[in-house]
């Protein structure tokens, strides 16, 4: 109305008034009309907009409670604001829109070319990464093995997901995918849920008593004599009686000869440790593994693992039991459901090589998707411990001596600094296992295996059958385990120290007599001997008291200078090696080894280390350090590396 009145007044003025002296008056009035009209329209628009927004706000319900319910609260650890504007900027929104556009293009292309496209989520308004998560989960269950492997690899490489998206996969993935993620080097630990709560112990019970009950529930008849002994000791009435029964006997674990410096000291044993050692032996029998699982052994072992985080020896024995149980595929689902994969996924990333290697063995036995081989107790893969796209072209096997170990025998040479301090140092300064730290980097196409044969039976030597400790028995047992691990399917180089070299010779001789083992003979490319007593050792003759403390009696007889068994082994091996196309390299010590503060002995002299084949290189070190290079560019390591590369040159080139 006001606008119409104003226009009428203006028209009357123009009609009744005399003509203006200037034409500018007319245009000034027009401009005033336009200004007034524009202001009126703009003000009205703002008012109407405000009223509409106010009305919409008053009619909108608060859905915060509903949104909270939609969050993955049961697995989402750290909550975030529901206001998307707080979390996502322009860059995120642009990337999101770009991803949507790409997905539409791919879907269109798939329709045009009639190709496969998972369009399950193409019409659903969800987060871009949520779509990727569910697509990967669907892909991980594909019937195509290559697609499953690719899905696991893509999951392990994810770095941009939210916390709840990792938890979605942890909650929704199957056993095969979870194991694959645990064996993927770059996997985020958020893929693995915490193990389920452990059942409460019975009233007035303890882990020690539960272990005894578990051990007592296992079959006690038709067992090996040594397993019966282990079980009887573990079921003794008290830890004091265990220590008394163990009294003064020697344990051949760890570093070997250095322990001889403390003849009068005997490690104190606990009931739990004895029970675990007995369970290790029982777990080598498949039917006993079923009993352990049925009687709650997996949960009990997990409780012990958590209670003894500061005791590596306890944890290693638990891992050995678990690795043995994982050899039985029908137990895989139970092992995964019990939460062990989460623990193993963390352990395999440990900086401590022994802990990581034990976890790697168990996970490899669980991973039937990519690992056809089975790793029995005492067979440890040092490289590769994760899934890898690197083709493995050859195997290098490390066999320690009688008083050695699968890891410590192959450590870097010790200095005056304490070994426990070295472990915490940077790996470039000191390594506790040079085959894993050095050789794996220099030759990534190798599978590196370290073997440990069971010498702990020497603790109860009076009750165990003597043939178990013979070179023949040990070699047959190791040969069986190595063949199960796929040794012989690829070219092989053997690396041995001390008595380990005698075992290698005996294994090759035994393999040559069995048609099913011929692949090991045909694929052997070379052997390295570090101070191997081919013709016996003076250590066995030095002193009756010392020799029985250092070696079980049968080993003393077999390692005696010019013993009949040793001579037969040497002659048979030379005859066997005549027409075989493999290389041989021998190192020998030139310095005596100190045993105690007043005794020093040249353990393997030059003439005993001479096999009669290949090169023999004297090195100015003692018997313990002959297989422990001082550093990576030391002669010992560089010559070993050169030999391995030369022996496998043709195989590594292919």
Curated annotation (Swiss-Prot):
- Tell me how this protein sits in the membrane: Single-pass membrane protein
Endpoints of the signal sequence: none
Q: Name one GO cellular component term.
A: membrane
| A GO BP entry | phospholipid biosynthetic process
UniProt entry keywords in alphabetical sequence: Endoplasmic reticulum, Lipid biosynthesis, Lipid metabolism, Membrane, Mitochondrion, Phospholipid biosynthesis, Phospholipid metabolism, Transmembrane, Transmembrane helix
Matching SUPFAM superfamilies, A to Z? alpha/beta-Hydrolases, ARM repeat
Q: What does this protein do?
A: Facilitates the transport of serine from the cytosol to the mitochondria by interacting with and stabilizing Sideroflexin-1 (SFXN1), a mitochondrial serine transporter, playing a fundamental role in the one-carbon cycle responsible for the synthesis of nucleotides needed for mitochondrial DNA replication. Plays an important role in the phosphatidylglycerol (PG) remodeling that is essential for both mitochondrial function and intracellular cholesterol trafficking.
Name the UniProt record assigns to this protein? Protein SERAC1
Higher taxonomy: Eukaryota, Metazoa, Chordata, Craniata, Vertebrata
Q: Quote the gene name from the UniProt entry.
A: SERAC1
């Amino acid at each position: 109305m006001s606008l119409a009145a104003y226009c009428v007044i203006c028209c009357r003025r123009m009609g009744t008034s005399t003509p203006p002296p200037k034409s500018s008056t007319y245009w000034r009035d027009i401009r005033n009309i336009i200004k007034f009209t524009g202001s009126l329209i703009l003000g009205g628009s703002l008012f109407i907009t405000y009223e509409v927004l106010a009305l919409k706000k008053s009619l909108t319900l608060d859905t915060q409670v509903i949104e909270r319910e939609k969050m993955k609260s049961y697995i989402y650890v750290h909550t975030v604001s529901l206001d998307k504007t707080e979390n996502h900027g322009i860059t995120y929104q642009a990337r999101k829109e770009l991803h949507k556009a790409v997905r539409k293009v791919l879907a269109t292309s798939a329709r045009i070319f009639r190709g496969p496209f998972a369009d399950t989520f193409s019409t659903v308004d969800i987060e871009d990464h949520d779509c990727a998560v569910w697509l990967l989960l669907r892909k991980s269950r594909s019937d195509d093995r290559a697609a499953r492997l690719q899905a696991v690899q893509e999951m392990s490489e994810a770095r941009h997901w939210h916390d709840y998206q990792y938890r979605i996969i942890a909650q929704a993935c199957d056993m095969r995918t979870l194991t694959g993620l645990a064996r993927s080097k770059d996997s985020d630990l958020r893929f693995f849920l915490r193990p389920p709560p452990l059942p409460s112990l019975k009233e007035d019970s303890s882990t020690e008593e539960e272990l005894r009950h578990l051990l007592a529930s296992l079959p006690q008849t038709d067992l090996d004599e040594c397993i019966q002994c282990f079980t009887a000791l573990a079921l003794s009435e008290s830890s004091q009686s265990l220590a008394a029964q163990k009294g003064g006997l020697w344990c051949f674990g760890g570093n070997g000869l250095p322990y001889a410096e403390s003849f009068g000291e005997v490690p104190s044993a606990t009931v739990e440790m004895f029970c675990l050692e007995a369970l290790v032996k029982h777990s080598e029998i498949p039917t006993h593994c079923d009993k352990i699982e049925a009687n709650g052994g997996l949960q009990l072992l997990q409780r012990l693992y958590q209670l003894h985080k500061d005791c590596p020896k306890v944890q290693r024995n638990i891992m050995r039991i678990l690795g043995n149980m994982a050899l039985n595929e029908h137990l895989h689902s139970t092992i995964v459901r019990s939460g062990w994969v989460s623990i193993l996924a963390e352990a395999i990333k440990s900086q401590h090589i022994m802990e990581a290697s034990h976890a790697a063995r168990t996970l490899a036995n669980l991973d039937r998707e990519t690992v056809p081989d089975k790793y029995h107790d005492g067979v440890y893969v040092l490289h590769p411990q994760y899934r890898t796209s690197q083709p493995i072209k050859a195997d290098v096997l490390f066999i320690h001596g009688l008083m050695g170990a699968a890891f410590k025998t192959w450590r870097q040479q010790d200095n005056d600094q304490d070994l426990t301090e070295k472990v915490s140092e940077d790996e470039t300064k000191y390594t506790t296992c040079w085959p894993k730290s050095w050789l794996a980097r220099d030759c990534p196409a190798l599978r590196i295996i370290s073997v440990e044969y069971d010498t702990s039976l020497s603790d109860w030597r009076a009750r165990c059958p003597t043939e178990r400790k013979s070179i023949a028995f040990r070699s047959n047992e190791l040969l069986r385990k190595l063949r199960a691990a796929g040794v012989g399917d690829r070219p092989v180089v053997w690396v041995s120290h001390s008595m380990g070299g005698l075992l290698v010779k005996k294994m090759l001789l035994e393999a040559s007599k069995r048609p099913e083992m011929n692949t090991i003979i045909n694929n052997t490319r070379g052997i390295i001997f570090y101070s191997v007593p081919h013709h016996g050792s003076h250590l066995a003759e030095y002193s009756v008291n010392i020799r029985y403390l250092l070696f079980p009696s049968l080993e003393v007889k077999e390692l005696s200078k010019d013993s009949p068994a040793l001579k037969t082994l040497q002659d048979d091996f030379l005859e066997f090696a005549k027409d075989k196309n493999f290389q041989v390299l021998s190192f020998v010590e030139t310095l005596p080894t100190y045993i105690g503060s007043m005794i020093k002995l040249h353990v393997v002299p030059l003439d005993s280390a001479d096999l009669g084949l290949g090169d023999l290189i004297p090195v100015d070190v003692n018997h313990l350090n002959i297989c422990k290079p001082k550093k990576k560019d030391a002669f010992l390591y560089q010559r070993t590396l050169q030999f391995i590369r030369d022996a496998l040159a043709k195989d590594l080139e292919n």
